[in-house]
Structures are given as structure tokens and as C-alpha cells.
């Protein structure tokens, strides 16, 4: 599994003008790392074997055809890789967990092998023609699982203290850097994506103050950027804080490490406000699902023509993959933030994946 489908290549081919730096969806670096949890993800892309190189090369070519930079996002799903449970395979995490399915703790040797897998995935990204990799340490995937006390109950060097919980993410960062240096890949971009806090009611995996310490440690490794995954909007703040997440984390970076934030950017006005007041660089996710030429329109002085909302008439211009279309025409968007105007296309939902074992809303994972 893990191959780039024709639908996926077409989807990215239509988004080569979405931005100047194009970051792919996640690729799992180990066979145990995926697929993850929603429709379309049974065909989630992998980069754990050389057999994935052909598709990765096509993907890089599609993204770069208009002169933009292409970055491959690499991750391990950990407990979120429920496709393995469906396929009667082990689901792994830092510690034994009982979710909707059993999750077993990784052994020491498996941890070391996954670290090496991130390096091998980076080497394949270089060979495929990508300009960089983004290490995905957000959204409850394995790197975040090691950092969170909710999913890391280990008592060895990989768990317990904050320093020990940072050990796995930092080991991955160093392995990726080592491989890039060994390959002699000049100007190869390395970024790190993280969720700035993990708080679910009274359950606290970590606070933004702890993740600031992780970021400070990552900055010492001289990465190119930190990418904050924000569900509350680009201007959101931690509860009880006076400053936005963007302002707090930007202050923790040096001049060489840039901050990227994402969240609720659907117009040129919002994009400019974010860059002027909260961050160095913006990432646009759902905005480019609605309008695949989001960035190009701003750069060519046509920002006022950006399409902000979904309509039935506009659907063909979005060029979504079948999985994305099915997810965003569900009334619950599978727990993901909905597309603006999505209620106008709920009647186009086909139900293709509704009974698929992986069609479990994000919040239930």
C-alpha cells in the first residue's frame, strides 16, 4: 500500500499554483505507520519503501511544474494508524493503550528503527526531487504521542520527564538532518509541524509552555521553520494568555527559523493580516481546497477573485479527490473543520466510504 493514486496526482497537479511552497499530505515512513483514520486514507501515501519512489517523483513534478517549491510531509501514525487494526496488524504507540482497539507499546529496537525510517524517508524525498521535508509532530500522531503524558506512560529514557518526552522528536529531527547532510542536498528545507497544546477538557497531554520548550530545543537544531497546527484560527490564543499562539512561538525562534501558522485563512485580507501581525509565513489548507489558485491570485493582483465558499456550481473547479469530496460533503466533515458553504453540497454526498471501517470521526481516535 501507500502508492500515489492517479486521483492524488490530478489533485496536486491542479494545485501547483496554490502557493509558493507546497506541502503535501502526510506520508507514513514505516509500514507500521499507516494508513490513518478517514475516507481516502486507506490509500494514504507511504514513503517506507523504494516502491513508492515512482509515485513520489510524479507528485514532485506535478507540484513543481510552475516553479514552486515542494515539501513532503513525513510522519508515523502511531495509535492513529487504525488501518493496521482493520488489516489484523499491530497498532503501536509509546505505551500500551486501550482505544476502540488495542494498542501496544513500541520496543526499544522498534523505536530506533522508526527513527531510522524517518531518515530513509528523507533520502527518498530527496531522490524523488522534493525540495524539503516537513516532520509531522502534530495532530496526535506518533511524535506528539511521545511528547504527551496522555499517551506516553514509559519509565525508560523515552518517557517520564519533559526532557525524556522530547527525546524521540529530537532524535527524529537529528536523523533527518544527518541524512540531508550525508546526501549533500544543498538548500534542502527541513520543517517541523506541531500542535502547540494538547488539552481535551480536563485531560491535558501538554501545555503550550511545554511545547515552547520543545520548540526552543528544535531551534537549536537549526531547522528552517516551525509550523503550528491551529484549529482555532490564525489569531487564536491559549486560554488565559494575553498573546496569540503566533506571537508566543515567534518569540521563541531565532532569525533563521521562520514561523508558519495555519487556520481560517480564506481571503487575501486574512492572509495579509496574519503575515503582518502573527507570523512570518501562512499556510492555507481549506482555502486551497475551495480555490486551488489561492496564492497565484494574490501574487498576480487578483486576490479579489478568490473563491471563499463552496457552491454546487463551483465543485468541478475544486478538483478534490474522491476521499476529500466524501469527507467534506458529510454533515460532520468526519470531525474536521468544515469547508465554508459546505451545507450547499451535502446533497451530493455519495456515501462511498460511510461504512468503511476507517470512517471514524477524528475526535473519536
Where are these regions (language model features)?
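Flavin-dependent oxidoreductase catalytic cores
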Residues: 1-365
Amino acid at each position: 500500500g501507500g502508492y500515489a493514486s492517479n486521483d492524488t496526482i490530478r489533485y496536486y497537479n491542479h494545485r501547483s499554483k496554490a502557493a509558493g511552497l507546497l506541502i503535501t499530505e502526510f506520508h507514513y515512513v514505516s509500514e507500521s505507520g499507516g494508513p490513518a483514520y478517514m475516507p481516502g486514507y486507506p490509500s494514504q501515501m507511504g514513503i517506507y519503501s523504494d516502491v513508492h519512489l515512482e509515485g513520489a517523483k510524479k507528485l514532485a513534478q506535478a507540484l513543481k511544474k510552475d516553479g514552486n517549491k515542494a515539501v513532503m510531509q513525513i510522519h508515523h501514525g502511531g495509535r492513529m494508524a487504525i488501518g493496521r487494526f482493520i488489516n489484523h496488524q499491530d497498532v503501536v504507540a509509546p505505551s500500551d493503550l486501550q482505544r476502540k482497539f488495542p494498542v501496544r507499546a513500541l520496543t526499544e529496537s522498534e523505536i530506533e528503527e522508526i527513527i531510522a525510517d524517518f531518515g530513509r524517508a528523507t533520502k527518498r524525498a530527496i531522490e524523488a526531487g522534493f525540495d524539503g521535508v516537513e516532520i509531522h509532530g502534530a495532530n496526535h500522531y506518533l511524535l506528539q504521542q511521545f511528547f504527551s503524558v496522555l499517551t506516553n506512560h514509559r519509565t525508560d529514557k523515552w518517557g517520564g520527564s519533559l526532557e525524556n518526552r522530547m527525546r524521540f522528536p529530537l532524535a527524529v529531527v537529528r536523523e533527518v538532518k544527518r541524512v540531508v547532510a550525508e546526501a549533500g542536498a544543498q538548500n534542502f528545507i527541513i520543517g517541523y509541524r506541531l500542535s502547540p497544546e494538547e488539552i481535551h477538557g480536563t485531560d491535558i497531554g501538554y501545555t503550550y509552555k511545554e511545547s515552547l520548550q520543545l520548540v526552543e530545543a528544535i531551534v537549536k537544531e537549526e531547522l528552517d521553520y516551525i509550523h503550528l497546527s491551529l484549529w482555532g484560527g490564525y489569531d487564536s490564543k491559549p486560554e488565559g494568555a494575553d498573546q496569540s499562539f503566533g506571537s508566543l512561538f515567534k518569540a521563541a525562534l531565532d532569525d533563521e527559523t521562520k514561523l508558519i501558522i495555519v487556520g481560517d485563512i480564506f481571503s487575501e485580507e486574512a492572509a495579509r493580516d496574519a503575515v503582518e501581525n502573527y507570523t512570518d509565513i501562512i499556510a492555507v489548507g481549506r482555502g486551497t481546497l475551495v480555490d486551488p489558485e489561492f496564492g497565484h491570485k494574490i501574487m498576480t493582483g487578483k486576490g479579489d477573485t478568490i473563491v471563499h465558499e463552496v457552491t454546487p456550481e463551483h465543485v468541478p473547479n475544486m478538483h478534490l479527490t474522491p476521499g476529500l469530496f466524501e469527507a467534506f460533503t458529510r454533515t460532520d466533515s468526519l470531525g474536521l473543520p468544515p469547508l465554508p458553504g459546505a451545507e450547499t453540497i451535502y446533497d451530493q454526498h455519495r456515501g462511498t466510504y460511510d461504512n468503511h471501517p476507517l470512517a471514524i470521526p477524528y475526535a473519536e481516535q
